[in-house]
């Protein structure tokens, strides 16, 4: 199923070695749909590296996931939560009294004691105000703490007076009282998380609690909070640099966090009330719950806002951000060359660039990009500079000229300088040739024009796909929004705007509410109405004009970065006249006091900026503030106020208030300490100002912690002036004395070591330095507490965000929390940023030639480090930066290095160079590799990593390494958030997939609803990613995890067969195929059914592995405990293969079942082949309809058809193959008709050929080739065009394992060439004879005697026959020339030389004797051809083997002229008709005796001649067997003048069930016997498949089985080839008779006994001499050279026309 079921509990896999296990039901509530929901705690289980089963599993209860589940999901996944009656067991409710063992009366007495002690402590605390606390008070508090540790008394301490007591104690100036308060709080909080949270919440929500708490009291509460949240949100941020946050900011964050968690608990509790279930409309929230949700959203927005400021994420908002996420499906892999959407094109200027080439941002490292540029760049291409390099600036363009092995290696002609300059590969961006760039510019212009037309409109979330990519996204496009809804803000947008309205002070708040009332018909707006208000967009734009003038700086920054402002602010305000001045006001607010700048106009601000300063412009402070404009004047005024005499408070306080609102000048002042040591005067001035500022209470609210690192830089610098250092010590001592929070900050920055080094340098002569060091040292535990707190708060916020995402998935309700997208953007920030190269390591050492070690990291693939030493002693040592976990370590090599290229590399790790004992990986490098991945995703930090080259290619000694690539972890929160997001997503959707799978297992019809279910889930994730996830990597991580957790398990379940062997999806596809006729029938329910099936299958094959194949690299295999995985990318690696494998396997099974049923029922039908082709075409169309044009499913279709064919018995398979060969023959024969019918025939032929292609590689192909060869021979020897034969063979050529039809077609080409050479040979012979005649013209008279021959006489033919009986060589040559001077219409004779090996000849006894059966003028031509062929065969350059001999056959055809008719006849018919030229009649018996033909062959030839269209009549006579043939009298039946009559005997088809098929079966069974016997004789060792084939062929020819007599009885089937043997081997492998060796698949051995149809035969004769020499058969075609007779005589005769 989806996960793993152990002990009746469902375990969800979350990654390698990680499982989630349902542990406890926490609470229950009523969901938005009115059905109960249950919150389950899922524990994270880790499987140990060693051991299996339960012994290797460790339950980490600190790691858990809280998940709300429906009742159906509980039934499917959490059997432990079900009672005996099948109902969900509710959460356990244990009262406090059940826990303790105290008697009720004793408990009541103790409660009375507690109340009296509380009253006494309050009285004693009020009496000792301002004095030392007396001992009785301390004793009372001590007793109260003891009582507080008793759990049954917890309820007494919930008295409000206890909080008053704790508040008084915590605010007491006496340390012992504050310490006692901490003890009491710890005692009360030791019972359970609920009590602890309640106490913390009650204390933290007290008004102005910060004013009553000192450092120790605040730390006590913070420690309690850290203890309370440590086990709740166990999350590690190791490797991420967290900022230094002072205690007061942390305490504020704790208050916000506790308030948010309290409201969240109230929301969950309110949903569990009984009345909530009776709500008539579950989607509509009640007033109380709606108010709670509003308060929670506002509180969560406040927490996110303060957390962003505390983490200083907002300071990075001005940095250039990555491009916006490209539109498209998050469930499909993004192509590398996807062009950005229109918004990106509008935001950035369009550079000239060609889409053909990849930018540098798409590569993981500079080395990889340099290799790409080196391999792609060609001379003449345009390039652009990406970095500043010496004389060339970034952005300069030029033309690439050449490259070499130097440094830098690339020469470019730069347009900016007008000359060439050398740069590095990785600094260039390829633009392409000029024509490519121009095309790109035109495309950019067109895109810009389109963008300009749609500017100001809301662009769609994605673009329509072209028609060639139908179903490219797994969901339908969202429905058009309601016009009325489009005119109003969504609830989330309104609540985000409402958040800023609630931030306003009283008068401003009332003014904004007044604006709302005026635009909403004066409706009275209370909190409940505000929460559900429908605000028009125009009103929201007016509010966005009003709010910036009334918000403080912090809130204004939040407003500018929020979603609603970005969506409706700039676009809506662009046409407003007040907009420019408003923007100026906002910029001024970011620099100066908001209230003051709001009153000043733009001109006043410019005048103020141009006023000359009152002080000398040459002072260091003046020069410092020059770049800050009006904002810098605050620092000058502050210095003047501090240096003036008299009362300074009135002058300094307003300036400090301005700095609190706008701290940039103050931060600049402190950061000036991190300037060069030469600025001594500036440093002293700044330190004097800072030291005086500390004495003002208002100054403590300034962000000192954000710039303390500048003080640390000055403190650590060895060149800092002693006076500056002393002033810095004074300042820091004063700052830490006033607020110990900053001592904690200094401790976190390592100030203790820096102060110790300064004391050591100045010999201890720094005043207050030791005291400052001791103070910093005492805050060590507080620094640890602060780090823990910020981790817990951040982890808690992430968990709450994940909880809101889960609620969004479950309830389909929008997320209405302000700044939710901002928080996710910062968490995902840096998802495309990696620690690269030199940021990972400190130094690189090599075994030899250290002066060339820099070549390993110079990003130049043409340079290299070459070792110098003995083989196997070369190594590269990497000293890693502390805490860096290697994500990928890659070695760059080059195959051109030949023997210098590494062949085996071992990577070791250790804590020092002397302890490199742990082998991390070993890799064998392929000779063709260029990038060798050595390590991936290490989970442990190794200070030292050594790469050892153990062996080189071709036994080389020294090695060459082209470069190193080291990728470290991503130094952002993205890896942590990705892990948590993927875990929660995986758990949620795997639980849901299990529930859906159980539904479909119980009722297959629920499969029809699966597509809508999946569509809803995937569409929701897509919309969430479009709204909240900022970049492609984050969206792809979510999409892949969702797809793997939801779709992959569902596919696995619906494709798994049940007890009957049928899977749910297979049943659905069967129904689809069986009801094809109802697809387009609107009157039936078919279209809706088919639509659902198609939508489901299109959805399931949505993700397809379309990435380019990876380069040829060596794949590392991590070993042992150092094995590591990036489980978050499991969806990428395993998803497409698993889903596609399951779906294709299911489709193959369905096709195999369909085809098998068809073959079983219809294999004997006369129209079997057309119906099969039609069925196959339906299957093909269905595959395209269901799965699109995907090769995997087409292959599954073919494999399914092949599987059905393989199940046929041999004779049935032979019958099927003969039917296909016959059908193809009929279609080719019928294609000669012409016209539309010919096109229809060709279309049917093409359809049949597609179905025949399935035979390729199957055993049936051998049988099919046998029959196709016979029918093709008859066609080639008839009047059929050979081009069609070639086209057919080109398409189904793989179906002929012996390639006999191809050889037959090749022999025709060879015959044509021989015919051309024979024509030249005849001309040469004629030239020689004419030359002789010229020399002997008196002895020979030319042409007169021969002109009297008008017809052939029987005497001449008899004489010629007599001359052949006793023939000598000279006589043969004389006979060869007897028709050279024949003056009649010489027929054209074409001879086809056919190879006996490839052409099927029925029997060699049917041979033609030209001496007896042909007239002299034809006989001489054949004799000359025989002489010509013998001479050509005897030529040493043409034939070096045994000389072939010719044997004439009766095969072939001819054209005869009979009156006005042209007769197309066979060779036998030609002989018969010519034989009747001078005979009135001839008996069939005499013809048989004279020709030596068989009766069947002669009767087959006589049949068409005696038909109604034939020229002969057959007269039956009693005394003459077979009858008498006579020429039909043509006077009775007038004939047309140029009538063409086809009399060639029709095609004779073989029967697979006859003798021919039985011989094929005998041959196959004999081969099976031989294979089994030979493998039995070799035992378990087996034989190599090539050796087995040779032994079988040898046994077939020489013995010991079968006997020669049986082989002869097989006829043509007795021939055996290696292809036949391989076909039988495949058959036996499929039956399980043979098996392959796992380690050596080319070796076969006998597996199990098998029943083989073995004939009862004897062994072959061992002494046989082998087969006869090969014979070559000949077929002649006769064509007339002259013009046919124009007139016919009364007595018609047959003349040879062709």
Curated annotation (Swiss-Prot):
One of its GO terms (cellular component) is Cul7-RING ubiquitin ligase complex. According to a report, may not be neddylated despite the conserved consensus site for neddylation at Lys-1576. Structural study of the Cul7-RING(FBXW8) reveals that both CUL7 and RBX1 are in orientations that are incompatible with neddylation. Residues 814-993 form the DOC domain. The modification Phosphoserine is found at residue 339. Its main location: cytoplasm. Highly expressed in fetal kidney and adult skeletal muscle. Also abundant in fetal brain, as well as in adult pancreas, kidney, placenta and heart. Detected in trophoblasts, lymphoblasts, osteoblasts, chondrocytes and skin fibroblasts. CDD domains: APC10-CUL7. The keyword Transferase does not apply. Residues 601-611 have a biased composition (Basic and acidic residues). It comes from the Eukaryota. Residues 360-433 form the CPH domain. Keywords: Cytoplasm, Cytoskeleton, Disease variant, Dwarfism, Golgi apparatus, Host-virus interaction, Isopeptide bond, Phosphoprotein, Ubl conjugation, Ubl conjugation pathway. InterPro entries: APC_su10/DOC_dom, ARM-type_fold, ARM_CUL7_CUL9, CPH_domain, CUL7/CUL9_N, Cullin, Cullin_homology, Cullin_homology_sf. It is found in: Cytoplasm; Cytoplasm, Cytoskeleton, Microtubule organizing center, Centrosome; Cytoplasm, Perinuclear region; Golgi apparatus. It is linked to 3M syndrome 1: An autosomal recessive disorder characterized by severe pre- and postnatal growth retardation, facial dysmorphism, large head circumference, and normal intelligence and endocrine function. Skeletal changes include long slender tubular bones and tall vertebral bodies. PANTHER family: CULLIN AND GALACTOSE-BINDING DOMAIN-CONTAINING, CULLIN-7. The CPH domain is essential for interaction with p53/TP53. Component of the 3M complex, composed of core components CUL7, CCDC8 and OBSL1. Component of the Cul7-RING(FBXW8) complex consisting of CUL7, RBX1, SKP1 and FBXW8. Within the Cul7-RING(FBXW8) complex interacts with FBXW8 and RBX1, but not with SKP1. Interacts with CUL1 (via the C-terminal domain); the interaction seems to be mediated by FBXW8; it is likely specific to FBXW8, but not other F-box proteins. This is Cullin-7. It comes from Homo sapiens. The lineage of its organism: Eukaryota, Metazoa, Chordata, Craniata, Vertebrata.
């Amino acid at each position: 199923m989806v996960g793993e079921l152990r002990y009746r509990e469902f375990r969800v896999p979350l990654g390698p070695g990680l499982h989630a296990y349902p542990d406890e039901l926490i609470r229950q509530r009523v969901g938005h749909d009115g059905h109960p929901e249950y919150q389950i705690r899922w524990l994270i289980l880790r499987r140990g590296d060693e051991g299996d089963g339960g012994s290797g599993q460790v339950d980490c209860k600190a790691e858990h996931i809280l998940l709300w589940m429906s009742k159906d999901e509980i039934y499917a996944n959490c059997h432990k939560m079900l009672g005996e009656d099948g109902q969900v067991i509710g959460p356990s409710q244990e009262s406090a009294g059940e826990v303790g063992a105290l008697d009720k009366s004793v408990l009541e007495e103790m409660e009375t004691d507690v109340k009296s002690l509380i009253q006494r402590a309050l009285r004693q605390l009020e009496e000792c105000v301002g004095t030392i606390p007396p001992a009785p008070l301390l004793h009372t508090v001590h007793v109260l703490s003891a009582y507080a540790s008793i759990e049954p008394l917890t309820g007494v301490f919930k008295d409000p007076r206890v909080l008053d007591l704790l508040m008084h104690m915590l605010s007491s100036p006496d340390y012992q009282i504050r310490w006692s308060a901490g003890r009491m709080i710890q005692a009360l909080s030791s019972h359970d998380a609920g009590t602890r949270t309640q106490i913390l919440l009650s204390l933290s929500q007290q008004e102005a609690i910060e004013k009553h708490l000192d450092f120790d009291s605040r730390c006590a509460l913070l420690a309690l909070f850290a203890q309370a949240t440590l086990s709740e949100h166990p999350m590690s941020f190791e490797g991420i640099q967290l900022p230094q946050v002072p205690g007061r900011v942390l305490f504020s964050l704790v208050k916000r966090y506790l308030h948010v968690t309290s409201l969240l608990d109230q929301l969950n509790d309110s949903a569990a009330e009984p009345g909530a279930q009776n709500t008539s409309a579950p989607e509509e929230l009640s007033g109380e719950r709606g108010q709670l949700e509003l308060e929670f959203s506002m509180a969560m927005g406040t927490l996110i806002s303060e957390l962003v400021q505390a983490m200083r994420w907002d300071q990075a908002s001005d940095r250039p951000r990555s491009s916006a996420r490209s539109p498209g499906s998050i469930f499909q892999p993004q192509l590398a060359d996807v062009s950005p959407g229109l918004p990106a094109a509008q935001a950035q200027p369009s550079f000239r660039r060609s889409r053909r080439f990849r930018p540098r941002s798409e590569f993981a490292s500079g080395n990889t990009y340099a290799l790409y540029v080196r391999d792609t760049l060609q001379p003449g291409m345009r390039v652009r500079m990406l970095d500043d390099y010496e004389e060339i600036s970034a952005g300069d363009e030029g033309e690439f000229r050449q490259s070499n092995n130097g440094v830098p290696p690339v020469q470019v002609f730069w347009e900016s300088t007008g000359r060439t300059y050398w740069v590095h590969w990785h600094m260039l961006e390829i633009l392409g040739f000029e024509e490519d760039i121009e095309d790109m510019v035109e495309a950019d212009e067109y895109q810009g024009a389109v963008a300009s037309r749609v500017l100001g409109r809301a662009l769609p979330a994605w673009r329509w796909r072209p028609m060639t990519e139908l179903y490219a996204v797994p969901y339908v496009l969202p429905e058009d929004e309601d016009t009325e809804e489009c005119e109003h803000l969504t609830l989330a947008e309104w609540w985000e705007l409402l958040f800023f309205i609630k931030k306003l002070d009283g008068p401003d708040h009332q003014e904004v509410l007044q604006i709302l009332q005026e635009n909403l018909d004066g409706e009275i707006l209370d909190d409940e109405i505000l929460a559900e208000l429908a605000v028009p967009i125009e009103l929201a734009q007016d509010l966005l004009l009003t709010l910036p003038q009334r918000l403080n700086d912090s809130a204004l920054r939040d407003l500018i970065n929020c979603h609603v402002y970005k969506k409706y602010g700039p676009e809506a305000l662009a046409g407003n006249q007040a907009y420019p001045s408003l923007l100026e006001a906002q910029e001024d607010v970011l620099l100066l006091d908001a209230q003051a700048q709001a009153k000043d106009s733009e001109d006043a601000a410019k005048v103020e900026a141009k006023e000359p300063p009152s002080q000398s412009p040459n002072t260091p402070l003046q020069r410092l503030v020059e770049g800050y404009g009006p904002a810098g004047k605050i620092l000058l005024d502050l210095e003047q106020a501090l240096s003036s005499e008299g009362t300074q408070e009135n002058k300094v306080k307003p300036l400090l208030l301005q700095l609190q609102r706008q701290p940039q000048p103050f931060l600049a002042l402190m950061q000036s300490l991190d300037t060069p040591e030469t600025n001594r005067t500036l440093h002293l001035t700044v330190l004097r100002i800072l030291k005086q500022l500390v004495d003002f209470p208002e100054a403590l609210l300034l962000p000192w912690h954000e710039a303390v690192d500048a003080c640390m830089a000055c403190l650590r610098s060895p060149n800092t002036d002693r006076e500056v250092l002393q002033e810095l010590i004074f300042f820091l001592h004063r700052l830490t004395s006033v607020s110990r929070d900053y001592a904690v900050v200094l401790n976190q920055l390592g100030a203790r070591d820096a102060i110790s080094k300064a004391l050591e340098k100045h010999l201890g002569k720094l005043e207050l330095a030791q005291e400052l060091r001791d103070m910093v040292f005492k805050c060590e535990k507080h620094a640890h507490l602060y780090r823990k707190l910020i981790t817990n708060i951040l982890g808690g916020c992430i968990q709450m965000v994940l909880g809101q995402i889960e609620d969004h998935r479950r309830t389909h309700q929008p997320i209405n929390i302000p700044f939710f997208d901002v928080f996710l953007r910062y968490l995902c920030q840096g998802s495309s940023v990696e620690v690269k190269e030199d940021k990972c390591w400190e130094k690189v050492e090599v075994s030899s030639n250290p002066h060339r070690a820099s070549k390993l990291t110079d990003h130049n693939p043409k340079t290299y480090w070459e070792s110098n030493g003995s083989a196997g002693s070369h190594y590269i040592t990497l000293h890693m930066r502390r805490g860096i976990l290697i994500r990928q370590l890659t070695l760059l090599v080059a195959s051109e290095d030949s023997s210098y290229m590494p062949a085996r590399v071992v990577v070791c790790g250790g804590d020092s160079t002397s302890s490199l004992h742990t082998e991390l990986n070993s890799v064998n490098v392929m000779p063709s590799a260029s990038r060798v991945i050595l390590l991936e995703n290490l989970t442990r930090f190794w200070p030292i990593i050594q790469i050892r080259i153990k062996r080189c290619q071709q036994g080389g000694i020294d090695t060459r390494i082209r470069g190193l690539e080291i990728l470290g972890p991503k130094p952002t929160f993205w890896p942590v958030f990705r892990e948590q997001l993927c875990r929660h997503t995986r758990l949620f959707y795997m639980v849901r997939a299990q529930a859906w799978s159980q539904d479909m297992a119980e009722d297959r019809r629920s499969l029809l609803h699966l597509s809508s279910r999946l569509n809803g889930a995937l569409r929701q994730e897509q919309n969430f990613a479009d709204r909240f996830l900022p970049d492609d990597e984050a969206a792809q991580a979510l999409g892949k995890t969702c797809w793997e957790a939801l779709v992959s398990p569902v596919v696995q379940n619906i494709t798994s067969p049940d007890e009957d062997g049928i899977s749910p999806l297979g049943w659905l596809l069967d129904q689809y195929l069986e009801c094809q006729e109802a697809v387009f029938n609107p009157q039936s329910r078919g279209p809706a059914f088919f639509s659902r099936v198609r939508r489901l299958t299109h959805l399931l094959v949505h993700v397809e592995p379309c990435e380019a194949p990876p380069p040829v690299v060596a794949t590392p295999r991590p070993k042992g405990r150092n094995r590591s995985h990036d489980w978050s990318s499991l969806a990428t690696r395993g998803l497409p293969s698993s889903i596609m494998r399951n779906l294709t396997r299911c489709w193959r099974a369905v096709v195999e079942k369909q085809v098998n049923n068809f073959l079983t029922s219809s294999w004997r039908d006369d129209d079997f082949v057309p119906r099969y082709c039609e069925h196959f075409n339906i299957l093909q169309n269905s595959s395209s309809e269901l799965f699109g044009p995907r090769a995997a499913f087409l292959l599954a279709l073919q494999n399914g058809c092949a599987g059905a064919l393989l199940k046929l018995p041999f004779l049935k398979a032979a019958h099927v193959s003969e039917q296909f060969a016959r059908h193809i023959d009929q279609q080719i024969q019928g294609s000669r008709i012409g016209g539309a019918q010919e096109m229809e025939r060709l279309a049917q032929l093409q359809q049949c050929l597609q179905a025949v292609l399935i035979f390729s590689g199957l055993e049936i192909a051998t049988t099919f080739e046998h029959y196709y060869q016979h029918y093709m021979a008859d066609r080639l020897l008839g009047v059929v065009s050979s081009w069609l034969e070639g086209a057919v063979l080109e398409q189904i050529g793989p179906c002929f394992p012996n390639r006999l039809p191809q050889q037959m077609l090749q022999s025709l080409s060879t015959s044509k060439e021989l015919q051309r050479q024979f024509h030249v040979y005849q001309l040469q012979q004629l030239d020689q004879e004419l030359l002789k005649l010229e020399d002997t013209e008196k002895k020979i008279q030319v042409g007169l005697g021969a002109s009297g021959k008008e017809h052939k006489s029987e005497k001449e033919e008899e004489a010629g026959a007599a001359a052949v009986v006793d023939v000598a060589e000279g006589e043969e040559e004389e006979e060869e020339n007897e028709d050279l001077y024949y003056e009649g219409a010489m027929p054209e004779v074409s001879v086809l030389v056919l190879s006996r090996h490839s052409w099927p000849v029925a029997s060699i006894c049917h041979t033609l004797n030209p001496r007896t059966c042909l007239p002299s003028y034809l006989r001489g031509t054949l004799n000359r051809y025989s002489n010509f062929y013998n001479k050509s065969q005897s030529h040493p350059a043409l034939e070096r083997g045994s000389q072939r001999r010719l044997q004439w056959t009766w095969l072939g055809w001819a054209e005869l002229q009979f009156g006005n008719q042209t007769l197309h006849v066979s060779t036998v018919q030609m002989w018969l008709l010519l034989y009747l030229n001078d005979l009135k009649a001839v008996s069939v018996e005499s013809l048989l005796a004279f020709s030596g033909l068989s009766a069947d062959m002669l009767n087959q030839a006589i049949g068409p001649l005696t038909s109604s269209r034939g020229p002969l009549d057959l007269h039956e006579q009693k005394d003459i067997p077979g009858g008498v043939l006579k020429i039909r009298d043509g006077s009775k039946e007038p004939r047309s003048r140029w009538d063409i009559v086809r009399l060639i005997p029709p095609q004779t088809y073989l029967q697979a069930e006859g003798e021919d098929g039985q011989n094929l079966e005998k041959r196959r069974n004999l081969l099976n016997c031989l294979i089994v016997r030979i493998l039995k004789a070799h035992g378990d060792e087996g034989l190599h498949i090539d050796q087995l084939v040779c032994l079988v062929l040898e046994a077939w020819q020489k013995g010991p089985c079968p006997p020669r007599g049986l082989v002869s009885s097989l006829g043509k089937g007795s021939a055996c080839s290696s292809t036949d043997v391989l076909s039988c081997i495949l058959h036996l492998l499929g039956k399980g008779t043979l098996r392959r060796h796992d380690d050596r698949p080319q070796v076969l051995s006998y597996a199990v006994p098998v029943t083989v149809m073995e004939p009862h035969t004897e062994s072959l004769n061992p002494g046989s001499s082998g087969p006869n020499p090969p014979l070559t058969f000949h077929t002649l075609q006769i064509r007339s050279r002259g013009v046919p007779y124009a007139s016919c005589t009364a007595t018609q005769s047959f003349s040879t026309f062709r």
